């Protein structure tokens, strides 16, 4: 997959937050990944009440899903991140996770504050759209 990030100087510097303003992708297979949360392989929450731990676990789960689809995190064109309102005042853990998992050519990303997710212990959920060759 070919992916090219565009970050016009007329838009704010989103790279400091770990995402690109625009991503143009070319490939032949589209991968849609359901929202990933901080569950381990047994369905147990990782990092209850801890946005940092939950963010990193959700991103690890996303990486696992991409491998299962035959791709890598580098193939992700866009992310949609849902953050519970109670945790949205300090989003540094989310930024830190994005910078750690997408250090180069990060995907386009939308952050959405929500009143709650599927379970009360979830603070973040991340869904992805990728393009593979």
Name these PLM-found stretches.
Residues 1-60, 64-77, 84-133:
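N-terminal presequence-like segments and the immediate start of the first folded domain
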